[in-house]
Amino acid sequence: MLGGYDLEMQEIERLLINHNCSYSNASLNWQNAHLSQYAHEISALSKSDTNIYGIELFEDITPPPNYIRIDHHNDFSDRPTSLIQVAELLNIELNRYQQLIAANDVGYIPAMMSLGASTEEISAIRLADRQAQGVTDNDEELAIKSINNLEQCNDLIIVKALTPKFSPICDRLFPYKALLIYTDQELTYYGDLVPKLKQLFEEHINSHKIYYGGNDSYLGIAKKAFSPNEIINIISQIKLLYENV
């Protein structure tokens, strides 16, 4: 059962097709990638001897005993990327392109650079990832307009996004030391203070309002988990860490 769609999930689906594996794709995004979206499939297989694999699905319902979670976020952040986990289950080796997809998913551009990726390879992977996430030409244009109004707080760049798609903003601003992108409904921070922010917002992480991943390279809030004023308050707390540097 596939979770929210991006380049990694797209490649996982391709692997499953190429190896004749049965799977379900509810065409989910990161906001609605919940286990309950597959309640019908789970009900049909819960009492069988077949293992049910859920890939990056938030467990908003209790999974059956034969359910196995594949993930590398939050409490599963010490595990390999989901693409690597699926490849291991299928007993196959990833090719160069797939290795770059996995690196991109867990560590963004720096992780691809650590594999010796060329500028052309990085650009191709990032473009493919944005397209898989549903980024449109209009989103790309709005990203440029958003960047034109960025705010700088020492090493922290703050951008209020005019689009819900943050990736075209990230890609255009890279490299950066720390980046915070937000709207009235959500927020994502990219930088090396994630461990400190995990401590600061531990209560919200435990209540699944805040998530993190990418080897502690990013931290975000679930869409509509906080009011606009609460988001501004969270931004203020993060800014304070940089103002005191």
Where are these regions (language model features)?
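C-terminal accessory domains and tails appended to enzymatic cores
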Residues: 1-44, 48, 118-245
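Gly/Ser/Thr-rich loops at beta-strand to alpha-helix junctions
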Residues: 3-9, 58-60, 74-76, 104-109, ...
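Short, glycine/charged-enriched secondary-structure capping and boundary segments
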Residues: 14-17, 66-69, 82-84
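General beta-strand structural signal in soluble alpha/beta enzymes
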Residues: 24-27, 53-56, 68-71, 94-97, ...
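Long, hydrophobic/aromatic-enriched structural stretches that serve as scaffold segments
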Residues: 46-80
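Short glycine/proline-enriched coil/turn segments at helix->beta-strand junctions
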Residues: 63-67, 95, 206
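Short alpha-helices
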Residues: 70-128
